[in-house]
Amino acid sequence: MSQNGDQNVSETIGIVGGGLMGHGIAYLLAAAGHKIAVYEPSAELRITLPQRLEAIAALLDEDAALTKKISVHDALAPAMRGASFVFEAAPEKLPLKQQLFAEIEKLVAPETILASNSSAIPSTEIGRHLKHRERVLGTHFWNPPHLVPLVEVTQNEKTSAETVRRTMDLLRDAGKVPVHVRRDVPGFVGNRLQHAMKREAIALVASGVCDAETIDTVVREGFGARTAVLGPMEQTDLVGVDLTLDIAEVLYKDLDATPGPHPFLREKVKAGKLGMKTGEGMRKWTLEQAETVRRRLSQFLAGQAKARRKAATR
């Protein structure tokens, strides 16, 4: 049963990777009524996968019994058996992804769609050496994938229109909001937008304009307060393209244009200031503060996800 209450076709879907992204992708597709097989080479991740899936069900107030539709395997072949779709969520290393896709191609039917969840590596490169490149594309889920609705469906120069259509239909029926990215550029759409803002934020802090906490406050309590209901192109049309041009004439020449990562970012990494996991990054964090941020984000996104599912079944 799809998220909008309609009957949809149950697919057999293989998931490569049961870690940070893979387990959430497995859950949301199982919740949509599909049979899921996860390949995870790490024994530790295989052992913890059932508990992590049950935690998602508890967070969303859903029946944990649906996780029984998800099987876990320590070898690739059984997880690919009979799959009509394969979603790869392996570490962000091109040689690894290319090797996995080459092995997967030998195990599945020619019409099986092969999708990579890479957040930056173009699917053109991942599938470059495959025989059936027309069925390869990118499906960039946002973390956590079971809570954030967007999926960037990115075609490459060889991807067929049928591959895009089938993938968009599957994701839409699972309650996601897929968007079609027509060119396979690094970072796709979302990460390019996100990192354009992050580059300017880092430059502002590095140059002493403000501190990191001020950046976060300005985003959350300023334009971020409307971003969920008003995208940047809508906002441009709302205030006027002419006004946007006037502002751009004054502002754009002063925005940061550092080629490559800002030296300030490199200095943080060199000093071991890696963020919440080390107690300091752009800001300082206690264990309690870090946990509060994670819990606040999870509860907020879960509330939105439950509201969307409730609205879809009315």
Where are the regions that the model predicts?
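NAD(P)-dependent Rossmann-like dehydrogenase/reductase catalytic/cofactor-binding core
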Residues: 2-5, 32-34, 173, 207, ...
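Rossmann-fold dinucleotide-binding core
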Residues: 113-191
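Internal alpha-helical scaffold of NAD(P)-dependent oxidoreductase catalytic cores
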Residues: 34, 153-184, 195-225
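Rossmann-like NAD(P)-binding element
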Residues: 41-44, 48, 58-113, 121
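Hydrophobic/aromatic beta-strand patches that form the interior of the parallel beta-sheet core
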Residues: 37, 73, 87, 137-139, ...
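Structural/interface elements that position substrates and couple domains in central-metabolism enzymes
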Residues: 54-57, 190, 194-200
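NAD(P)+-binding Rossmann beta1-loop-alpha1 motif at the extreme N-terminus of oxidoreductases
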Residues: 2-59
